[in-house]
């Protein structure tokens, strides 16, 4: 069996590494990654949930001492200025697990040299490759006719380099602003991603670039490095003919809140791995589309409580409707359970061991309480 991954961005690298690692002892499986070295990976420093560092540790010998990707600790996400009840809300990850921030250029080099798959430098059409299974990870599409929009109030970002040491924080920062919110990714000054580790996210149909730049510079000590516009979207057909699978930005793009992308890439390749090697799933497309729509909904929920700013953006952001009975059911559950019982059963809690997209009940409980109950710190 031959499996080919096309593209070596975040999605392509994690796809090839997962497949190469989990099939390494199967002599009947060959994994190959083909990419154009002239096509640069994402420039912005990345943040993850816990699966990415777990895979990198297992398959590349990455660790916090031997750290060639300038990774920094991510113990959770600190929300500043969100809602009307608390100045700060901390979305804590389980204390026995650690997510990360990393430089995508250096991660690409680490993965391509892992030895778990063959690497070929070339420009190819995935649909013309002779292989049993193909993963199309060529990045954002030029034509969106086979895609649908994801609901989100953000469509632009100004990237910047910080003039302070961001690595003192062991968490991502999500700071509410009059025009949206700003991410601050703890990044070493020697990392290639340091120039792009602060991002002011906004809606270009509401705020002008000039006003946004002024607000950005007034709120943060940064040097602006790049302007980015984007769409939030998902492929209508993530799996084509049970042979070609879209992943990475070829599959979807959703604004960076909650760092959902890399976890989703790994979840999707895991679904497909199980489909190929263990049991056939006739509903692959429906499954991943539902998963990504859940990511969309959880992110939208963060805007519904507003922020300390009463502006046009925040009025607009609160208008998005979440149309999912499962979402409403879980929200009702977390309103009637203590934060301790919301812990997973494995940790001594009594909550159901479920996930909505990527989030267990304790994540839901953290946000619900932070938006509705004054936290004593």
What are these regions (language model features)?
Residues 1-11:
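Beta1/beta-strand and adjacent pyrophosphate-binding region of the FAD-binding site
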Residues 17, 21-25, 113, 186, ...:
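Short, well-ordered alpha-helices that flank and scaffold nucleotide-derived cofactor binding pockets
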Residues 20-44:
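Glycine-rich FAD pyrophosphate-binding loop
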Residues 38-89:
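N-terminal FAD cofactor-binding segment of flavoenzymes
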Residues 47, 92-113, 137, 204-207:
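Short beta-strand to alpha-helix junction loop
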Residues 114-216, 220:
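Predominantly flavin-linked oxidoreductase catalytic cores and closely associated redox partners
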Residues 188, 202-305:
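FAD/FMN-dependent oxidoreductases across multiple families
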Residues 278-377:
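Long, low-complexity C-terminal extensions of enzymes
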């Amino acid at each position: 069996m031959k499996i080919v991954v096309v593209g070596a961005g975040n999605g392509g690298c994690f796809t090839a590494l997962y497949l190469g690692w989990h099939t390494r002892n199967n002599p009947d499986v060959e994994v190959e990654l083909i990419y154009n070295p002239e096509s640069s990976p994402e420039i912005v420093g990345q943040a993850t949930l816990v699966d990415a560092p777990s895979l990198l540790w297992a398959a590349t010998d990455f660790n916090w001492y031997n750290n060639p990707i300038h990774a920094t600790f991510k113990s959770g996400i600190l929300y500043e200025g969100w809602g009307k009840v608390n100045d700060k809300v901390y979305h804590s990850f389980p204390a026995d697990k650690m997510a990360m921030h990393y430089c995508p250029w250096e991660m690409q080099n680490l993965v391509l040299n892992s030895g778990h798959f063959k690497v070929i430098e070339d420009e190819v059409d995935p649909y013309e490759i002779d292989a049993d299974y193909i993963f199309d990870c060529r990045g954002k599409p030029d034509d969106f006719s086979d895609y649908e929009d994801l609901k989100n109030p953000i469509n632009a970002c100004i990237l910047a380099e910080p003039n302070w040491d961001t690595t003192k924080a062991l968490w991502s920062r999500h700071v509410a602003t009059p025009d949206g919110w700003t991410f601050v990714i703890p990044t070493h000054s020697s990392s290639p991603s340091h120039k792009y580790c602060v991002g002011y996210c906004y809606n270009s149909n509401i705020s002008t670039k000039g006003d946004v730049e002024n607000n950005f510079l007034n709120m943060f000590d940064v040097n602006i490095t790049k302007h980015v516009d984007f769409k939030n979207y998902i492929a209508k057909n993530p799996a084509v003919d049970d042979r070609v699978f879209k992943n990475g930005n070829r599959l979807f793009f959703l604004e960076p809140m909650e760092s959902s992308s890399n976890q989703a890439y790994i979840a999707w390749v895991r679904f497909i791995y199980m489909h190929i090697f263990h049991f056939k799933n006739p509903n692959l497309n429906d499954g991943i589309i539902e998963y990504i729509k859940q990511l969309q909904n959880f992110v939208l929920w963060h805007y519904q409580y507003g922020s300390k700013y009463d502006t046009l953006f925040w009025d607009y952001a609160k208008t998005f409707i979440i149309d999912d009975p499962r979402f409403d059911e879980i929200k009702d559950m977390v309103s009637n359970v203590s934060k301790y019982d919301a812990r997973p059963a494995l940790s001594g809690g009594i909550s159901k061991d479920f996930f909505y997209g990527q989030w267990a009940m304790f994540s839901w409980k953290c946000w619900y309480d932070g938006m509705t109950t004054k936290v004593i710190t």
